Each structure stands twice: as structure tokens, then as C-alpha cells.
């Protein structure tokens, strides 16, 4: 017979996951309604769906990828796609799964239930703060930072976010005294896979963990043996993961010079200042920044307080929550990049202070019941909106795919224009991804696709005028935001591929 204490803990865990599901549904409903292009149509966002569909069809595989390999993301999407929800339905469900995985990572960081502790309450509170940041960021396309809502996509590092949280949680378990023989193998696996699929994980997690262990060791808050085991596990696993990337060397076409431009550090700083300025011009943006900075400051305060109380476990979590965002910012500046998405640790790590060190006072039972009821009602109300957003027909896209399928011919278009049509086509090889000089653009695309004679072009507002292509004999076919330029029997020559 199950003991009352065990039943109570399981009920609390179930309630926590229920609250997390409700919050995730609310967040996805808002993202699907206000940022549907980012979720379903964006040129980068559809790569995981393209890869999973290609694998399911049994196509030959020769993908040209960025440094990110999308291995966990593709696995999750492919598994969810077997539910038969269609592309937008699967992407929507994937967004919910991503957010629930974030809650799971936060719950791991919160630690085990112990007398006097409320890890479930703290985890729900931390996840609610993360969801609040998603809601405050507003529609994609508005000026300012959009970091939290990226976790809802299959492309923008959701696996790296979750991998970082899980690694921090496992580190906390080691500090809590969990048997290393059980924790370390899992940690090694997570770190190796996370580094293999995205080397950014080293900056977000491996480096900050190493710095935190060093601080704990200098302050005598960790025994040397545990410090050595932790460093060996994360550093060794990261090295293994990075070496395994050698098997994908032919697929990683990104040049290092595109990502490391220290001579552009000044420009990167100026751009960060500009995006920060764009963020605070709206009330939502101002509130978003206030929440982010408040959580970061709270992490600093709790880290200092825990250090003085010789609570090395909570201090370690809070130090990590401070070091990782600073490391991410340093990377953006030193690399001279304009990729704001590298700054995501600012939105998913400082929130864990609410889980690692939840408020001392408990919420009155009556208020808890009221909050649970409101949350449940909001989640139920969010479902129809989410379903409507996921099933909303795209007449323009349907027009393009019908025309291409009926023609049986091959056309071409630029990256931001053809990605969504390629995903919607029965045979994506009927659209060749090119640049404005008609050279095949091998970026986040399967190079094994056949490239038949090109006899039409697709254009939209994002298309850069094609150089050297005369359109005087082309018949325009209007499909809303798209225009098909049909050249009939005239074949447009393609140049040498580039990436």
C-alpha cells in the first residue's frame, strides 16, 4: 500500500505538470495567433519539418546545414508527425512539447521534495515567469528582443535550452548528494548529444558549469573529488560530442568566418543597444526588460545570500543563472554577430532562481484553488484558438502548390520565398532554392534532391530582383502574396551551387 506521504508527493507532481500544460497551451495559443509566420512559415523554422518529411519518404539524404544539426528536434518532430495532425498541427503540438520540456528541466533544477521544501510550487512559479516573458514579447516582427518565444519553434535551439536546464538539474542532483554512478552517465549523455547537435551548448552550459565548479572549489563549497568528477564529465562529454561532429563534416557547410567576426564587436554592441532601445519603447517591452533584469538581480542576491549561509547547492544554481547570460552576451560581442537568439540564457536561466529558492511563505489553499481554476479555464479557452490558428487555411500557399503540382514542372525561388512552398509540396524537388543570380543556394536544404530544368520562378515581397533574368516573355500567375513567373518551355540556366 502506498504511503500517504508518497501519494501526496505524486499528487503534487501531477498538479505541477497539469499547471505547466495549462501554461504551455496558453503560451502556444498566443504564439500561434500572433507569430504564426515564425511558427509555421519562416524560412529557418521549417527545416526540421523538411528533414523529417524527407526521412519519412525515404529520400536520399545530403543536407547542407548550419553548425546546428537539429538531431533531437528532428527526432521529436518525426515522432509527433506519426499522429497524423498535418504539418501545422504537428508544429503546434511540438511547441507545446517544447514548453513542457522546459518545465521538466526547471523541475529537475528545483531538486527533490524534502520536508520544508516546495520544489513543485517553485517550478510552476518559474515556468509561469518564463511563459510571462513569452507573452510579453509580442508578435514576431515587432521591434525588440524576441527570445522566450523562440523556444516554441523547432529550429531556434529548443533542444539546447532543454539540454542546458537538464544539465544544470543533474549538476544540482550531484551537489545534493545523489549517487554519481547514476547521475554522471546521464549527464555525459546529455552533454555529448547537446554539443554534437549544437556547439553553442558549450558557451551556454559547459563553460558556466566549469566556472561555477571553480568558484565552489575556491570557496570550499564542494569537495575536490566531486569537482573533479563534474568537470571531467562535462568537459569530456563535450569533447566527445564535438569530435562526433566530424561524422557530419560534409553536411556542415557554414564557414567559420560567418560566425566569428571579432572585428565587428563594436557593431554588435551598437546593434544590441539598438534592439534594447526598440524593446523599451513599448509597455510590453519595458515590462519584459524589467522582469528579465529583476530575475537576474534576484539570482545575484540569492547567490550571495546562499553563499553566506553555506548553501552551496542553491548558490551554484544561482551562479550558473548569472554566468551563462553573461557568457552568451560576451559571445555575441566577441563574435561580432547580429544573432539575438544567442542571448536566450537571459530568459530561461534566471527564472530558475524561483525554483531553486522559492518564496518562504506558502500560498493559502483557497487562493491556490482559485488560481488553479482560473488557469484551467484559461487553458481550455486557449485550445479552440490554437486549433483555429493551426488549421487556418493559407489560400496563397495552396494556390502555389496546386499550380506546381498540376504543372509537373520544376521552378526556382529564393530562400525566404520557397521554404514554405517546398514544405507544402508533395515533391519538394519541384522547387529549387537559388540566390538572385540563379545559383542553387545550398543552405538548410537537401542537396540530394534532383534539380530538373527550371521553367518558372516564384517571387514575393522578400525576393531580391533576379540578375540577368529577362521576364518579358513570362506569364505572371497571381497567388496572393506570391507571384509565379511562368516561362513556358523556356529553360532558365542555373549556375554553380553555393552556400
Short names for language-model regions:
Residues 155-160, 203-204, 284-291, 315-321, ...:
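Hydrophobic/aromatic-rich transmembrane helices and adjacent perimembrane loops
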Residues 47-53, 63-86, 264-276:
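Short hydrophobic/aromatic helix or loop-helix immediately within or flanking a transmembrane segment
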Residues 116-172, 338-350, 415-416:
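Membrane-interface micro-motifs in multi-pass membrane enzymes
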Residues 391, 405-443, 456:
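Short periplasmic/luminal acceptor-recognition loop of GT-C membrane glycosyltransferases, typified by
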Residues 182-199, 203, 207:
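Membrane-interface alpha helices of multi-pass inner-membrane proteins
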Residues 16, 20, 235, 308-312, ...:
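Signature aromatic-anchored transmembrane alpha helix within multi-pass, membrane-resident enzymes
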Amino acid at each position: 500500500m502506498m504511503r500517504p506521504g508518497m501519494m501526496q508527493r505524486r499528487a503534487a507532481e501531477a498538479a505541477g505538470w497539469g499547471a505547466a500544460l495549462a501554461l504551455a497551451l496558453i503560451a502556444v495559443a498566443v504564439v500561434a495567433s500572433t507569430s504564426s509566420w515564425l511558427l509555421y512559415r519562416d524560412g529557418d523554422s521549417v527545416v526540421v519539418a523538411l528533414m523529417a518529411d524527407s526521412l519519412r519518404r525515404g529520400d536520399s539524404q545530403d543536407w547542407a546545414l548550419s553548425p546546428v544539426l537539429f538531431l533531437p528536434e528532428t527526432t521529436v518532430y518525426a515522432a509527433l508527425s506519426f499522429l497524423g495532425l498535418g504539418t501545422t498541427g504537428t508544429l503546434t503540438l511540438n511547441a507545446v512539447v517544447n514548453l513542457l520540456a522546459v518545465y521538466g528541466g526547471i523541475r529537475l533544477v528545483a531538486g527533490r521534495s524534502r520536508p520544508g521544501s516546495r520544489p513543485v510550487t517553485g517550478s510552476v512559479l518559474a515556468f509561469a515567469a518564463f511563459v510571462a516573458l513569452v507573452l510579453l514579447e509580442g508578435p514576431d516582427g515587432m521591434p525588440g528582443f524576441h527570445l522566450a518565444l523562440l523556444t516554441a519553434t523547432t529550429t531556434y535551439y529548443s533542444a539546447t535550452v532543454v539540454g542546458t536546464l537538464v544539465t544544470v538539474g543533474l549538476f544540482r542532483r550531484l551537489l545534493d548528494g545523489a549517487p554519481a554512478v547514476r547521475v554522471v552517465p546521464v549527464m555525459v549523455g546529455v552533454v555529448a548529444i547537446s554539443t554534437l547537435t549544437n556547439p553553442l551548448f558549450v558557451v551556454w552550459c559547459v563553460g558556466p558549469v566549469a566556472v561555477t565548479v571553480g568558484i565552489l572549489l575556491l570557496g570550499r563549497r564542494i569537495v575536490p573529488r566531486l569537482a573533479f568528477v563534474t568537470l571531467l564529465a562535462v568537459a569530456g562529454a563535450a569533447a566527445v560530442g564535438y569530435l562526433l561532429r566530424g561524422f557530419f563534416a560534409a553536411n556542415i557547410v557554414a564557414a567559420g568566418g560567418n560566425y566569428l567576426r571579432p572585428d565587428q564587436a563594436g557593431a554588435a554592441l551598437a546593434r544590441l543597444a539598438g534592439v534594447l532601445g526598440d524593446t523599451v519603447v513599448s509597455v510590453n517591452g519595458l515590462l519584459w526588460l524589467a522582469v528579465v533584469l529583476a530575475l537576474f538581480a534576484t539570482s545575484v542576491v540569492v547567490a550571495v545570500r546562499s553563499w553566506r549561509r553555506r548553501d552551496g547547492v542553491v548558490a551554484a544554481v544561482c551562479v550558473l543563472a548569472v554566468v551563462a547570460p553573461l557568457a552568451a552576451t560576451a559571445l555575441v560581442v566577441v563574435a561580432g554577430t547580429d544573432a539575438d537568439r544567442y542571448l536566450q540564457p537571459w530568459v530561461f536561466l534566471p527564472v530558475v532562481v524561483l525554483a531553486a529558492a522559492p518564496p518562504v511563505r506558502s500560498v493559502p489553499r483557497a487562493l491556490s484553488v482559485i488560481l488553479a481554476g482560473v488557469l484551467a479555464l484559461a487553458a481550455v479557452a486557449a485550445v479552440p484558438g490554437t486549433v483555429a490558428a493551426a488549421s487556418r487555411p493559407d489560400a496563397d500557399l495552396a494556390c502555389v502548390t496546386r499550380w506546381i503540382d498540376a504543372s509537373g514542372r520544376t521552378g526556382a525561388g529564393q530562400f525566404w520565398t520557397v521554404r514554405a512552398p517546398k514544405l507544402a509540396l508533395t515533391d519538394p524537388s519541384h522547387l529549387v532554392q537559388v540566390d538572385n543570380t540563379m545559383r542553387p543556394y545550398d543552405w538548410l536544404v537537401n542537396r540530394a534532391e534532383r534539380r530538373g530544368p527550371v521553367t518558372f520562378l516564384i517571387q514575393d515581397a522578400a525576393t531580391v530582383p533576379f540578375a540577368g533574368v529577362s521576364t518579358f516573355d513570362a506569364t505572371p500567375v497571381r497567388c496572393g502574396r506570391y507571384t509565379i513567373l511562368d516561362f513556358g518551355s523556356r529553360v532558365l540556366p542555373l549556375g554553380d551551387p553555393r552556400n
